[in-house]
UniProtKB/Swiss-Prot annotation:
Residues forming coiled coils: none
One GO MF term: AMP binding
Main location: cytoplasm
Annotated EC: 2.4.2.7
Similarity section: Belongs to the purine/pyrimidine phosphoribosyltransferase family.
Location within or outside the cell: Cytoplasm
UniProt-recorded name of the protein: Adenine phosphoribosyltransferase
GO biological process: adenine salvage; AMP salvage; purine ribonucleoside salvage
Domain of life: Bacteria
Length: 180
């Protein structure tokens, strides 16, 4: 069966199990809470399988703090690869590789260990739960590339298409399981 044929049931599972939270974390934002999706065994298995197809060929899967860890670890297990946790700033002991990026109001930092893991030449797919503006995923890709890794793609469960995040990642291929 093709990806297109399999995407509809996965997209339906995602839609049925995504909790819409108005005005969170601030007024005017419609937060997409994927917690019920991750807690459902059938849905989590379907999401993991679909993301794993997009990550095939990677020798390491990277997940972004914190919900990206959930799906990245499951995908890495399915692909028999390792998983790399890309952490928010200040969560790892030094030394770290860090990448600062801008948010709507301020900035943030992503970090990975600077020793103990050699990423040079590793083919990495970055996985996260939601693609919004693309700032976090773009920063993660820059961070990994600076270590000598080859970032081959990004894959997300849910894309908020109206926010244009895909453009921030161009020309990196971005795979999504559903879009709103």
């Amino acid at each position: 069966m093709t990806d297109a044929g399999e995407a509809t049931p996965v997209a339906e599972l995602i839609a049925s199990l995504t909790r819409q939270v108005p005005d969170f974390p601030k007024p005017g934002i419609q937060f997409k809470d994927l917690t019920p999706l991750f807690a459902d065994a059938t849905a989590m298995t379907a999401v993991t399988g679909a993301l794993a197809r997009h990550a095939s060929g990677a020798d390491l899967v990277a997940g972004i703090d914190s919900r990206g860890f959930l799906v990245a670890a499951a995908v890495a297990d399915r692909l028999h690869t390792g998983v790399l946790a890309i952490r928010k700033g200040g969560k790892l002991p030094p030394p770290v590789h860090a990448e600062r990026y801008d948010l709507e109001y301020g900035s943030a930092t992503l970090e990975i260990p600077a020793d103990g893991i050699d990423l040079r030449g590793r083919r990495i797919v970055i996985i996260d739960d939601v693609l919004a503006t693309g700032g976090t995923l773009a920063a993660a890709a820059r961070l990994l590339r600076r270590t000598g890794a080859t970032v081959t793609a990004a894959a997300v469960v849910f894309e908020l298409g109206a926010l244009g995040g895909r453009a921030a990642l161009a020309p990196l291929p971005v795979h999504r399981l559903t879009c709103q």
